[in-house]
Amino acid sequence: ITGNQAITTKKLKRVMKKTNEKGKLLNLFRTKKFVEENFEADKQLIIDKYNELGYRDAMIVKDSIKSYDDRTVDIFMEIEEGQKYYLRNVTWVGNTLYPSEQLNFLLRMKKGDVYNQKLLEERTSTDEDAIGNLYYNNGYLFYSLDPVEVNIVGDSIDLEMRIYEGRQATINKVSI
């Protein structure tokens, strides 16, 4: 692996779940056969790891697989990390039910934080106290949130959180 500076080669190898080095104790319970689809999934895991650390432009620019012998392959990857990005401003558009301050509190991402796309996804939709759950738990089943990068200056990103609240759903009939 070349081109990586923000994450060590050792850590990148650990990120890969299905593609692994021969002769490591860690590989005892992992697959032994090289599978191209698993390698593609592992490459995406590497990019996801970079995205978590603020490297939203990270990409694997080259990769090659070369047969070493009958039983093993050598894998070469070149990574282009790009620059690290930070959150500058978060603005909310379309929210009428809850004030921006309350939504910012639930988002728990503030100016100067590393731009972590995984954390953004978790805090808007998958966490137990995610913003989506605030709406869903109050009957806004048609709610949607679209985080849009509206301005990128240097290493800073302005996010516009576009909310469509929709109508509140009500229960019409209950049959038991």
Please give the residue ranges for each predicted region.
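Interaction-mediating elements
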Residues: 1-176
